[in-house]
Structure formats: structure tokens, C-alpha cells
Amino acid sequence: MSTAQVLLENFDIELPITRRLLERVPANPDYKPHEKSMPLGRLAVHVATLPALGTLILPTPECDAAKAKFPDPNFVSTEKLLADFDACSAETRIALANSSDADLAHLWKFSAGDFVFSNNSRSCTFQHMFFGHLSHHRAQLGVYLRLLNLPVPGLYGPSADEKPAAT
């Protein structure tokens, strides 16, 4: 199995899980559980557009965050959130499917001006910046839903909201 096939297998597991969570995001974009927390709408948009990292990492040798253009972080609606997620996911899936092991072994530099955050293989960078980053923010989003007393979908099995009542 190629590196791209392994990444795609994981991608195809994680994306539907993420979509189920995004489907539950309410139109309450300003909610913050703490003054230092990211507002719900911005967090949801960030999670929805994280798949776009693949179209940045896979075909390019580097990204300078000081010069890069990132998606608009403003929440419009849950429908737009899902449309953006689906579009970003489809583009990245194609980019992954078209990546060879040699492509994924190339170094990819992530910096902000002269400060270098990382300079690892595209495969490592994709796993870290996409899968790891996605899991982190998806967990945050689940906490926001819980604090708003909204049902949280099961991510890797049933959630407390999906378990049948004990008899």
C-alpha cells in the first residue's frame, strides 16, 4: 500500500466524522465558552476549511504564513460551512490520490517570515497539520456543543447523546 493510500484510508474515516460534527453547529457564531476561546463560528469555519491544507501542502514546497491567503474566518451559515467543507475535502482527496510516494517524501517548509515552524516531509506535515490539527479543533467544537447543551455526535463510537437509555 502506498503512502497516499494509507493517508486516503485515514482521510476517508476522519472526514465523515468531522462532517457529522459540523452538521450540528448552530447559528450562534459569537458564543465563546471563555474569554480567551475562539468564537464558535470562527472555530467551525476553521474546522470546515482545514481540509484545504492538503491543497496547500501536497503540490507546493512551502508556505510562508506571513504571505499566505487563508479562507475567510467569518461564519455565514451551517449550510455554507458544509458546502465549504465538502469542496475543500473533495479537492484535497484528489490531490492526495494523485500524490506519489516520492511526492509525499519531499520536504515541505512552513514558516512565518524568517521563523520556520517545520521543515518535514509532506507526508509527515499532512498527518500533523491536517489529522492532528483537525482532531484537536474537532474536540474543541464538541465541547462547545456540549456546553450549549446540544447533542454531540459519536466520533469513534456512540456519544452520551446516542447511547440507548439504561433499563
Model regions: which residues?
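Short, contiguous alpha-helical
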Residues: 8-23, 27-71, 110-167
